[in-house]
A protein has these predicted regions:
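Alpha-helical tetratricopeptide repeat
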Residues: 2-187
Length: 187
């Protein structure tokens, strides 16, 4: 019932149900994680953080708890500890592109531009049409003095925007024919 109330956005009722579940079983990390979500949606960030901490004391390998706590830590400005949570998630799930992208944003914010570029590049390699990844990578590349790389990323963004305006689907684009670019005209 608590999960249903959470899905119905009845957060106060969901929290009460999770309180009852915790009273019955204090060692269930999932209940604390779900109550943290209910508390978060009621703007009780301290309560949500406390629940994530308790959940991770119970189950230190719970990557959902680490991911959600990382998001919350980022929201409250605890960037370095948020990065630690995302590092944990990425170690558990190396293909978790959302965790990698979020870590990239945080690395960018904390001045680790090379780390941010690496994370953005990982996501872009997996999702080549992820335009916002190119935007953020271009900004980070400018910060490390890679103007050529930044220009290439900005060109990708501009091309994607023009293609969207002209109704060109990114999935139907054909690769540039590099052979035709090397041809010379006969005079």
């Amino acid at each position: 019932r608590a999960i249903l109330r959470l899905q119905q956005q009845k957060y106060k009722d969901a929290e009460a149900d999770f309180d009852h579940a915790i009273h019955l079983s204090t060692r269930n990390a999932g209940v604390y994680i779900n109550r943290a979500l209910a508390r978060y949606h009621q703007k009780n960030l301290r309560g949500a953080m406390s629940d994530y901490d308790i959940a991770l004391e119970i189950d230190p390998n719970n990557f959902i708890g680490h991911y959600n706590r990382g998001l919350l830590r980022a929201q409250v400005g605890d960037d370095n500890r948020a990065i630690e949570d995302f590092d944990f998630v990425i170690n558990m799930e190396p293909d978790n592109m959302m965790a990698i992208f979020n870590r990239g944003l945080l690395r960018d914010q904390t001045g680790d531009y090379k780390g941010a570029i690496k994370d953005y590049s990982t996501v872009i390699n997996e999702y080549p049409n992820f335009v916002i990844g190119y935007q953020y990578r271009a900004q980070a590349r400018k910060k490390v003095g890679d103007i050529k790389g930044a220009d290439a990323d900005e060109f990708k963004v501009l091309k994607a925007q023009l293609d969207k305006q002209n109704g060109v689907s990114q999935n139907n684009q054909t690769a540039d024919n590099s052979e035709s670019g090397n041809r010379t005209r006969k005079k």
